[in-house]
Protein backbone atom coordinates (compact mmCIF):
# COMPACT_ATOMS: atom_id res chain seq x y z
CA UNK A 1 0.00 0.00 0.00
CA UNK A 2 1.44 3.39 -1.03
CA UNK A 3 0.98 6.69 0.80
CA UNK A 4 1.84 10.14 -0.57
CA UNK A 5 3.83 12.32 1.79
CA UNK A 6 4.55 15.97 1.11
CA UNK A 7 3.39 19.53 1.42
CA UNK A 8 2.68 22.30 -1.09
CA UNK A 9 6.22 23.59 -0.58
CA UNK A 10 8.09 20.30 -0.56
CA UNK A 11 8.27 17.61 -3.22
CA UNK A 12 5.90 14.71 -2.70
CA UNK A 13 7.35 11.27 -2.05
CA UNK A 14 5.67 7.95 -2.62
CA UNK A 15 6.33 5.65 0.27
CA UNK A 16 5.81 1.95 0.31
CA UNK A 17 7.32 -0.78 2.36
CA UNK A 18 9.79 -1.56 -0.42
CA UNK A 19 10.89 1.84 -1.75
CA UNK A 20 11.13 5.57 -1.28
CA UNK A 21 11.21 7.58 -4.54
CA UNK A 22 10.48 11.16 -5.60
CA UNK A 23 7.19 11.84 -7.33
CA UNK A 24 7.32 12.97 -10.96
CA UNK A 25 7.63 16.72 -11.47
CA UNK A 26 4.33 18.51 -12.08
CA UNK A 27 3.62 19.66 -15.62
CA UNK A 28 2.38 23.09 -16.69
CA UNK A 29 -1.32 23.38 -17.40
CA UNK A 30 -2.74 26.02 -19.75
CA UNK A 31 -5.65 27.96 -18.30
CA UNK A 32 -8.28 29.73 -20.38
CA UNK A 33 -7.54 33.40 -21.04
CA UNK A 34 -9.54 35.87 -18.95
CA UNK A 35 -11.61 38.49 -20.66
CA UNK A 36 -9.69 41.73 -20.42
CA UNK A 37 -11.55 44.83 -19.35
CA UNK A 38 -10.72 48.47 -18.87
CA UNK A 39 -7.14 49.12 -17.76
CA UNK A 40 -6.02 45.70 -19.06
CA UNK A 41 -7.38 43.65 -16.17
CA UNK A 42 -10.53 41.62 -15.96
CA UNK A 43 -13.16 42.79 -13.50
CA UNK A 44 -12.82 39.57 -11.53
CA UNK A 45 -9.04 39.98 -11.18
CA UNK A 46 -9.43 43.57 -9.96
CA UNK A 47 -11.81 42.31 -7.30
CA UNK A 48 -9.40 39.60 -6.18
CA UNK A 49 -6.49 42.00 -5.71
CA UNK A 50 -7.90 43.66 -2.62
CA UNK A 51 -10.79 43.66 -0.19
CA UNK A 52 -13.88 45.14 -1.72
CA UNK A 53 -16.49 47.39 -0.17
CA UNK A 54 -19.99 47.83 -1.56
CA UNK A 55 -21.92 51.04 -1.00
CA UNK A 56 -25.56 52.07 -1.17
CA UNK A 57 -26.03 54.54 -4.01
CA UNK A 58 -29.31 56.43 -4.29
CA UNK A 59 -29.94 58.06 -7.65
CA UNK A 60 -32.54 60.81 -7.82
CA UNK A 61 -33.70 60.72 -11.44
CA UNK A 62 -36.51 62.65 -13.17
CA UNK A 63 -38.55 59.42 -12.95
CA UNK A 64 -37.99 59.01 -9.19
CA UNK A 65 -35.48 57.60 -6.74
CA UNK A 66 -33.60 54.38 -7.35
CA UNK A 67 -31.25 52.58 -4.97
CA UNK A 68 -28.49 50.21 -5.95
CA UNK A 69 -25.47 48.48 -4.46
CA UNK A 70 -22.20 49.53 -6.10
CA UNK A 71 -18.80 47.93 -5.39
CA UNK A 72 -15.99 50.41 -4.80
CA UNK A 73 -14.23 49.32 -8.01
CA UNK A 74 -17.21 49.75 -10.35
CA UNK A 75 -18.27 53.03 -11.93
CA UNK A 76 -21.72 54.16 -10.82
CA UNK A 77 -22.96 54.42 -14.44
CA UNK A 78 -21.79 50.85 -15.20
CA UNK A 79 -23.62 49.40 -12.19
CA UNK A 80 -26.76 51.40 -12.97
CA UNK A 81 -26.78 50.00 -16.51
CA UNK A 82 -26.21 46.48 -15.21
CA UNK A 83 -29.23 46.95 -12.92
CA UNK A 84 -31.39 48.19 -15.81
CA UNK A 85 -31.37 51.87 -14.84
CA UNK A 86 -31.26 54.23 -17.82
CA UNK A 87 -28.90 57.17 -17.25
CA UNK A 88 -27.56 59.64 -19.81
CA UNK A 89 -24.02 59.24 -21.14
CA UNK A 90 -21.99 59.90 -24.26
CA UNK A 91 -18.21 59.52 -24.19
CA UNK A 92 -17.88 57.13 -21.20
CA UNK A 93 -14.38 58.59 -20.78
CA UNK A 94 -15.00 61.38 -18.26
CA UNK A 95 -14.36 64.03 -20.87
CA UNK A 96 -17.87 65.42 -21.50
CA UNK A 97 -20.85 66.47 -19.39
CA UNK A 98 -23.56 64.07 -20.64
CA UNK A 99 -23.62 61.96 -17.47
CA UNK A 100 -23.28 64.90 -15.06
CA UNK A 101 -24.94 64.71 -11.69
CA UNK A 102 -24.80 66.45 -8.35
CA UNK A 103 -23.73 64.75 -5.10
CA UNK A 104 -26.31 65.48 -2.39
CA UNK A 105 -24.52 63.48 0.31
CA UNK A 106 -21.64 61.04 0.52
CA UNK A 107 -18.48 60.90 -1.55
CA UNK A 108 -17.06 59.49 -4.78
CA UNK A 109 -13.65 59.04 -6.36
CA UNK A 110 -13.69 60.54 -9.84
CA UNK A 111 -9.98 61.12 -10.23
CA UNK A 112 -10.04 59.44 -13.66
CA UNK A 113 -12.27 62.11 -15.24
CA UNK A 114 -10.87 65.14 -17.09
CA UNK A 115 -13.91 67.37 -17.70
CA UNK A 116 -14.72 68.88 -14.30
CA UNK A 117 -12.40 71.41 -12.69
CA UNK A 118 -11.54 71.44 -8.98
CA UNK A 119 -14.17 74.10 -8.23
CA UNK A 120 -16.94 72.09 -9.88
CA UNK A 121 -15.91 68.98 -7.98
CA UNK A 122 -15.87 70.98 -4.71
CA UNK A 123 -19.40 72.18 -5.58
CA UNK A 124 -20.54 68.54 -5.76
CA UNK A 125 -20.60 67.91 -9.50
CA UNK A 126 -19.95 64.32 -10.57
CA UNK A 127 -19.55 62.41 -13.82
CA UNK A 128 -21.23 59.06 -13.18
CA UNK A 129 -19.29 57.38 -16.00
CA UNK A 130 -16.03 57.85 -14.06
CA UNK A 131 -17.15 57.91 -10.42
CA UNK A 132 -16.51 55.14 -7.90
CA UNK A 133 -18.42 55.35 -4.62
CA UNK A 134 -16.22 55.81 -1.54
CA UNK A 135 -19.17 55.90 0.88
CA UNK A 136 -22.93 55.59 0.73
CA UNK A 137 -23.91 58.38 -1.64
CA UNK A 138 -26.98 60.22 -2.97
CA UNK A 139 -26.71 61.72 -6.47
CA UNK A 140 -29.14 63.83 -8.47
CA UNK A 141 -28.80 62.69 -12.09
CA UNK A 142 -29.61 64.27 -15.47
CA UNK A 143 -27.85 67.55 -14.56
CA UNK A 144 -25.92 68.32 -17.76
CA UNK A 145 -27.98 71.43 -18.62
CA UNK A 146 -27.59 72.80 -15.09
CA UNK A 147 -23.83 72.22 -15.18
CA UNK A 148 -23.25 73.74 -18.61
CA UNK A 149 -25.88 76.48 -18.37
CA UNK A 150 -27.42 75.34 -21.65
UniProtKB/Swiss-Prot annotation:
One of its GO terms (molecular function) is electron transfer activity. Its cofactor is [2Fe-2S] cluster. It holds the Pfam family Fer2. It is found in: Plastid, Chloroplast. Residues 55-145 form the 2Fe-2S ferredoxin-type domain. Binds 1 [2Fe-2S] cluster. [2Fe-2S] cluster binds at residues 91, 96, 99, 129. The keyword Nucleotide-binding does not apply. Keywords: 2Fe-2S, Chloroplast, Electron transport, Iron, Iron-sulfur, Metal-binding, Plastid, Transit peptide, Transport. GO terms for biological process: electron transport chain; response to light stimulus. Its main location: plastid. InterPro entries: 2Fe-2S_ferredoxin-like_sf, 2Fe-2S_ferredoxin-type, 2Fe2S_fd_BS, Beta-grasp_dom_sf, Fd_pln. Residues 1-52 form a transit peptide. One of its GO terms (cellular component) is chloroplast. Expressed almost exclusively in mesophyll cells. The keyword Plastid applies. PROSITE patterns: 2FE2S_FER_1 (PS00197), 2FE2S_FER_2 (PS51085). NCBIfam families: fdx_plant. Ferredoxins are iron-sulfur proteins that transfer electrons in a wide variety of metabolic reactions. Occupies a key position both for transferring the photoreducing power to Fd-NADP(+) oxidoreductase (FNR), hence the formation of NADPH, and for mediating the cyclic electron flow around photosystem I (PSI). PANTHER family: FERREDOXIN (PTHR43112), FERREDOXIN-2, CHLOROPLASTIC (PTHR43112:SF3). Belongs to the 2Fe2S plant-type ferredoxin family. This is Ferredoxin-1, chloroplastic. It comes from Zea mays.
